[in-house]
Amino acid sequence: PIRIERYVSALGHTETDVYLAGTQEWSVGTSAEPFDMESNLALVAGVSAASMVAVEAAMRKAGVKPGDRVSFVGHSQGGLLAARLAESGRYATSSLLTVGAPLGTVTLNGNYPALAISHSDDLVPELGGASKPTGITHFETHSGAGTLDVAGAHAREQYVATAERVEVSPARDSLPHWEASGEAHPQFFQARRTDR
């Protein structure tokens, strides 16, 4: 669930984009999968999580060093991870994009373009607490999923469709803009817990 792309921007900067998937395993304390419910609980509480350790290990393996320019993108648990990494102070965060992420316990400094997309019928973003952090632009809309389709409202595919609608809507003009450039070289990482 970890994708890392490195490239040289038009301005000559080495840039890294880190894409993080959501929860892969719903158990607590029994799975070797670090993107599990145990990591969800730890991340919402603001303490160390196995998924965070896995992402930072993947970043090191991809050649990312402290202080490097990094853009973080994530869905659900991956979005919460992205926000925590963006604010960790270990990287020069270029941007942050989260979708369906429970961000209520995260404090964002606002020193970079940041966008949180959520669905009004998705319960997961509310699991982080009722407050919405400052320092990030919030875009909320209905998912388009069925009336009682709670899982559908949180599905990555629904968020892809929402992002496509945002791209062509007038709301796009009020959202943060990112400049894409350079040829990216993707690397994919799968992590396992070694303590189980």
Which residue stretches match the model-derived regions?
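Gly/Ala-rich beta-loop-alpha elbow adjacent to hydrolase catalytic centers
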Residues: 73-82
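Extended hydrophobic-aromatic, low-complexity segments
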Residues: 82-83, 107
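Alpha/beta hydrolase fold serine-hydrolase catalytic domain that processes acyl esters and thioesters
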Residues: 1-68, 90-196
